[in-house]
Amino acid sequence: MDTILYLARHGETVDNANQIMQGQTQGELNENGLRQARELSEQWKNREIDVVVASDLKRSVDTATILAAPHGLEVVTTPLLRERDWGGFTGRYIPSLKNEVWPDDIESLENLLSRAGEFIAYVKKTYPGKKVLAVGHGIINKAVQAVYL
């Protein structure tokens, strides 16, 4: 049997709601984000999940913990699933960045896609034949999909 990988994004955070670029900051789920995680947990409670893997950032770990609970699973964390590092844009109000020149310290797309590939290889090697739920972030999840497909 092949390894099956399901991707989920963390619930909404305080910074998401305030349009702040989080990047690799920890982030705190807001009430809406907690509700989103609980709703997804309810929807997925009867699905067969063998492993829950999350980014090691708090917002993903907190979401993954809620999703793992009905399955009696512990959350495995990895920095490979961290969000893109936005460098000098981190912590800034997103609408104000529209006309800004991108700083040199933003994680390159090449590095982001490389991390995504490393994550896929890690999952296949570590959890062969398992159903893996991975809780990441918007951009890294898209990178995983781009590399996987």
Indicate where each model-derived feature is located.
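Alpha-helical elements of Rossmann-like donor-binding domains used by nucleotide-donor carbohydrate transfer enzymes
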Residues: E39, D62, I66, N111, ...
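Short beta-strand scaffold positions
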Residues: A54-S55, S114, V135-G136
